[in-house]
A protein has these predicted regions:
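Short, intrinsically disordered/low-complexity patches at protein termini
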Residues: 34, 40-41, 224, 246-249
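Acidic/aromatic/glycine-rich contiguous surface patches that form carbohydrate-binding/processing clefts
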Residues: 227-255
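N-terminal active-site beta-alpha-beta segment that forms phosphate/nucleotide-binding
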Residues: 1-67
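Conserved phosphate- and dinucleotide-binding cores of soluble alpha/beta proteins
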Residues: 53-225, 229-230, 234
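Short secondary-structure junctions and interdomain/linker hinges
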Residues: 8, 12, 16, 221-225, ...
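Residues that form generic nucleotide/phosphate-binding pockets
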Residues: 8, 217, 241, 245
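Feature targets compositionally biased, intrinsically disordered low-complexity regions
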Residues: 43, 51-52, 83, 248, ...
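Short amphipathic alpha-helical patches
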Residues: 28-32, 52-53, 104, 109, ...
Length: 255
C-alpha cells in the first residue's frame, strides 16, 4: 500500500507528511522517483531526507538532522497548507465514505448526523490532527485506509476531514482553497472520484484480490471503472527503496 501510494506522488511536489505510513509512502517516493520532492511535516520540519530509519515523529532527529528549515505547526499548517501552497498530502482514515469524507474522531452507535446532536462516541479515536487543515487547503491529497466494510462507509459517523461532502459541487460551494482527495489507496485497490458526481469508484485492484472481494468490503454500492485494471506488483527497485526508508521493517507488515 505504501508503494502504491508513493507512485501517486510527483517529483517536485510540496507535500506534507504525517507519522507512519504517510511518511513511508512519501519518503519512498523521494528515494524512488521523486528526488526533488519537497516534504514537510506538521511540526514544521521542511526539506529533509530521513536518516537512520523511518521517522517516528513529526519533529524527530531522523528528519530534523538534515532539514532545510525547522519552524513550527503554525508555519506548516497556517502558512504552507491553508494558503494553498501545498501540492499534495497523505492522510489516514478510520472511516471513509463514498465521497471521500474521513472520520478519525470517534465511532458511534448512533452517529451525530442521525440523532441531530453531538454525544460522546462509543470509541474515541485520535482526532484529525493536521488532516482537517490538509483536507481544505492542499491542492490535492491521498487517503490511505484498510479496506473493510466497517471502514468504507456509505456515510461516515463524523466528518473529521472533508472530502467532497455530499458529492457534485457541494465542496465547491464551500469555497475551500484545496481541491479535495485525488485517490483512496486501500489494502485492496485504488479508488478515484467520478469527475461529476465525486463518488469514488474502483479504478484498480491488487493481484491477490478480486473485484467481488473489494465490493463485499465496501458498504456503498461501489461502481467499477469500465477500464478497471490490476495494479502492477512492486518492482525490485521499489522494494529496495521502500526498505531503504524503513530500514528496520517497523511498518512492513502494515503496508
Amino acid at each position: 500500500m505504501a508503494i502504491i501510494t508513493g507512485r501517486e506522488i510527483k517529483d517536485g511536489e510540496l507535500i506534507i507528511l504525517g507519522v507512519g505510513l504517510s511518511m513511508l509512502a512519501g519518503y519512498f517516493a523521494q528515494f524512488n522517483h521523486a528526488p526533488n520532492l519537497r516534504p514537510f511535516t506538521e511540526g514544521g520540519v521542511y526539506g529533509s531526507t530521513p536518516v537512520g530509519g523511518l521517522p517516528w515523529g513529526i519533529e524527530c532527529n531522523r528528519i530534523s538532522a538534515n532539514a532545510t528549515s525547522f519552524t513550527n505547526a503554525i508555519d506548516a499548517l497556517g502558512f504552507l497548507v491553508l494558503s494553498g501552497r501545498a501540492d499534495n498530502a497523505v492522510i489516514g482514515a478510520a472511516q471513509v465514505d463514498k465521497y471521500g469524507n474521513v472520520n478519525t474522531t470517534g465511532i458511534w452507535d448512533e452517529p451525530p448526523w442521525k440523532t441531530g446532536r453531538y454525544t460522546p462516541p462509543k470509541v474515541r479515536l485520535n482526532g484529525s490532527g493536521g488532516a482537517s487543515d490538509i483536507s481544505v487547503g492542499c491542492k490535492r491529497y491521498l487517503i490511505m485506509a484498510s479496506h473493510e466494510k466497517r471502514r468504507f462507509k456509505e456515510r461516515v459517523d463524523y466528518i473529521s476531514s472533508v472530502g467532497y461532502l455530499t458529492g457534485g459541487d457541494s465542496r465547491e460551494k464551500c469555497e475551500f482553497i484545496g481541491g479535495g482527495p485525488a485517490a483512496i489507496i486501500s489494502t485492496l485497490g485504488i479508488l478515484r472520484p467520478d469527475p461529476q458526481t465525486k463518488e469514488f469508484y474502483l479504478e484498480a485492484y491488487y493481484p491477490f484480490t478480486t473485484i467481488d472481494e473489494v465490493k463485499e468490503n465496501t458498504e456503498w454500492d461501489l461502481k467499477i471503472s469500465p477500464d478497471v485494471k490490476m495494479v502492477p506488483e512492486p518492482t525490485k527497485k521499489e522494494l529496495k527503496n521502500l526498505r531503504a526508508v524503513d530500514t528496520t521493517g517497523s511498518l512492513r507488515k502494515k503496508g
